[in-house]
């Protein structure tokens, strides 16, 4: 069993296609494909790339795995623009990309596609792993090796997992947390609950990389839950116009 864990396509169709091609060339086949949010964005080089990425995710080609998708920062901004969240008018998006960026995102995804994105998961709990865009604290939570250890401990406790895979930072990293003594207490309406010892075993947070954020270079993660083996992949690719890509495909580019 081997998982491919992606994040941050950000509308970069060429990058996603490059990763899919790389997956086909692996010696050990992938059994599950996870995409941890930010499937849309403003990194596409062609008009309509966000729509094309969503179509590609929804309808894989014959022989390809159906991706399991969760919601990321860019999707949440899209929901805000379309009145599908508790925060209207996407103030986070406006602060990040300005009015032109807001307009570009609004025009790049159809209402039906936004509804499909809204139906996707917040995260995935598999075995002793949590796969999520940010963390249980929220979609915008950006964990990195520089995040304070006590904060990483908090996120792992909230995740109730030994391995937390996240994509918000866009970086590839592996960060082990080994608390020597850590207790947690939950307070409910009935008062404080019994203290729990959280220091029994080492846990880790894994940054899974970014497929589309860095032009020409896609990064993603492979993980085998049976052997606990983890590896990071880097794929270099050339960004091309749609017309050229179609001609290459007609010649057998990427065929099995």
Where are these regions (language model features)?
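Active-site environment of divalent metal-dependent phosphoester hydrolases
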Residues: 10-15, 41-44, 74-79, 137-139, ...
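His/acidic metal-ligating clusters that form di-metal
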Residues: 26-29, 106-182
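Acidic, His/Gly-rich catalytic cores of divalent-metal-dependent hydrolytic chemistry
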Residues: 175-256
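Active-site neighborhood of phospho(di)ester-bond hydrolases with catalytic His/Asp-centered motifs
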Residues: 6-7, 33-38, 68-73, 132, ...
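Short amphipathic alpha-helical segments and helix-helix/interface helices
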Residues: 20, 51-61, 114, 150-156, ...
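Core catalytic region of metal-dependent phosphoesterases/phosphodiesterases
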Residues: 2-6, 11-107
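Short amphipathic alpha-helical segments
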Residues: 17-18, 47-48, 82-83, 143-144, ...
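Beta-strand-turn-beta hairpins that frame and shape the catalytic cleft
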Residues: 1-4, 124-130, 199-205
């Amino acid at each position: 069993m081997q998982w491919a864990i992606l994040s941050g396509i950000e509308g970069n169709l060429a990058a996603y296609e490059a990763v899919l091609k790389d997956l086909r060339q692996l010696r050990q086949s992938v059994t599950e494909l996870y995409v941890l949010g930010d499937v849309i964005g403003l990194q596409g080089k062609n008009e309509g790339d966000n729509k094309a990425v969503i179509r590609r995710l929804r309808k894989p080609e014959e022989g390809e795995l159906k991706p399991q998708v969760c919601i990321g920062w860019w999707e949440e901004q899209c929901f805000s623009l379309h009145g599908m969240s508790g925060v209207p008018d996407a103030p986070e998006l406006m602060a990040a990309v300005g009015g032109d960026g807001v307009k570009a995102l609004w025009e790049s995804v159809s209402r039906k596609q936004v509804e499909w994105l809204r139906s996707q998961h917040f995260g995935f709990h598999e075995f002793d792993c949590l796969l999520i865009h940010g963390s249980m604290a929220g979609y915008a939570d950006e964990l990195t090796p520089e995040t304070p250890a006590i904060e990483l401990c908090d996120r792992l406790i909230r995740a109730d997992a030994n391995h937390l895979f996240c994509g918000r930072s866009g970086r590839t990293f592996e960060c082990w947390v080994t608390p020597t003594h850590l207790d947690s207490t939950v307070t409910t309406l009935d008062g404080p609950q019994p203290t729990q010892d959280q220091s029994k075993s080492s846990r880790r947070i894994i940054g899974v990389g970014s497929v589309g954020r860095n032009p020409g270079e896609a990064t993603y993660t492979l993980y085998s839950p049976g052997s606990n083996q983890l590896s990071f992949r880097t794929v270099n690719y050339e960004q091309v116009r749609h017309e050229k890509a179609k001609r290459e495909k007609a010649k057998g580019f990427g065929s099995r």
